[in-house]
Design a protein with these regions (language model features):
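Acidic/polar, glycine-enriched structural segments that form the non-catalytic walls/loops
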Residues: 1-102, 143, 174-193
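Aromatic-rich carbohydrate-recognition surfaces in CAZymes
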Residues: 103-224
Length: 224
């Protein structure tokens, strides 16, 4: 016996999950499982096909495209199709343009490699990420050093969004407000660590000893 199951996911509410299911799955594909499979295959072929490698070594090609898939799969959408999302203060917010979805992304040292890959082959996703980061800053007044579930975790001592936003800008991705981004990032870099009222930490963890000594002495911070 064949059993078909469809599910919708929302970080906002049940109505959002139903709407996401309707617009992203039920309306375009109905109960046709093969249509879903073929669409997923088509989408991924388009992304993976943006880089063409030449080699007679099948295993090398398999390794390359498998890891390219893993690198691109790291991003996730945190807003609903109607543009609603839950911000750092657990408030339901509404994007002016639902297409400017709130995108989660790994910050920790990925500006060296993964983010540059996005800038080169999927600039539209880098653009969404930058606009998302700026939107969240405008909501809470702070950029996030390493978000988890759109929260100010404070687990990262550095300010990697600077490198990621600047990297996107230098790659020609400029459909976001750099002036707003600059003001927010400057504020973050010049503020000692403090608790955020909605939970978590904002500011630069080791700013105080660095401003006093010009470096971070052993025992004065988590790193030296």
């Amino acid at each position: 016996e064949e059993v078909l199951v469809r599910s919708g996911v929302s970080l906002v509410d049940m109505a959002g999950a139903r709407n996401n299911l309707k617009q992203e799955l039920a309306d375009p594909f109905g109960w046709d499982f093969e249509k879903v499979v073929n669409n997923a295959r088509s989408v991924w072929n388009e992304y993976l096909g943006r880089i063409d490698i030449e080699t007679d070594d099948y295993l090398q090609k398999k390794k390359f495209y498998t890891n390219l898939y893993r690198a691109l799969a790291a991003k996730a959408t945190w807003s609903d199709v109607d543009g609603r999302f839950v911000d750092e203060d657990e408030r339901i917010r509404q994007l002016e343009k639902p297409g400017d979805c709130i995108v989660s992304g790994e910050y920790w040292n990925t500006f060296w490699n993964n983010q540059q890959l996005f800038n080169l082959i999927t600039p539209e996703i880098s653009s969404q990420w930058a606009r998302s980061a700026i939107q969240l800053y405008q909501n809470s007044g702070w950029f996030n050093t390493d978000p988890a579930g759109i929260e100010h975790t404070g687990v990262m001592v550095a300010m990697h969004p600077i490198s990621q936003i600047l990297g996107a800008w230098q790659s020609g991705i400029r459909d976001f407000d750099m002036h707003v981004a600059y003001d927010g990032l400057k504020k973050m870099m010049l503020t000692p660590p403090q608790k955020y009222e909605g939970g978590g930490t904002v500011g630069v963890e080791n700013l105080v000893p660095y401003m006093e000594y010009g470096y971070i002495p052993a025992g004065k911070g988590t790193v030296s």
